[in-house]
Amino acid sequence: MSFARFPFWRVAPSEREGEFILPVMPPATVGPEGAPHVMGGVALAAAVDALELASGQTLLWSNIQFLAPTTHAEELLVSCEQCGGGQSVGQWLAEIRSNGRVTHRVNAALGAREPSEQRLFSARPDVPAPDDCTPGDRGWGVPGTLGDQLDIRIAHEDEERGMQALWSRSQAGFKADSGWLAIVSDFFLGAHPATRGGSSLDDTFRFIQGCDDGWVLSVTEFAAFDRGVVHGSAKHFSQDGRLLAISSQSGVLPRIPRTP
């Protein structure tokens, strides 16, 4: 097992204003040997990083559409443009390309209306602590890819109700910031046996706050399987119970379900 010491979703500015480059490293990828591709959540995290750099503000929400594969991509080019907003909150667009082809489109809002008082209404469910849970399967690719970057523990599963509670953290000790939580938000299709091997269509990610301790509890609830597509949502909590983020997603179910 090998894991990245540097946040593998961080982008670097290009020579053009509002344009950023993500050098694709193995930890950013999933897939079988010989056919790695950038995990959708990593692409979202790269877009979030680029948008925060371009705007100088913190993400509020984003929605990404997964348009085309990124197999064997060596770098992703992220272009950011403000399209609206006021003095406190800006509305932005981002487009991600690989070898000139558009692979993702992102809508987002960034900023804050201050002063403001935080109130959290969603409460973390009572589940076993990470040390008391069964380790999860990280077999998402060959050694050195995204699966090696994660420590995963299954806190609760109910296939009949379409629910899962999953603890996860970075093996390298990365903070659960907006970028890392964007990656975590795309674990959606792994939360039910019938969805594994499917293809995400989108990911809507709402960022509340980050945390330093690393462990994140993702509580996923599937709403429906319909017309070959799954719909659902998730809430992401810190170990001390604070709400960190909210996400929702739709994905195409696999034609042939994977065997457990």
Indicate residue ranges for each PLM-predicted region:
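Terminal targeting signals and extreme-terminal segments of soluble enzymes
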Residues: 1-260
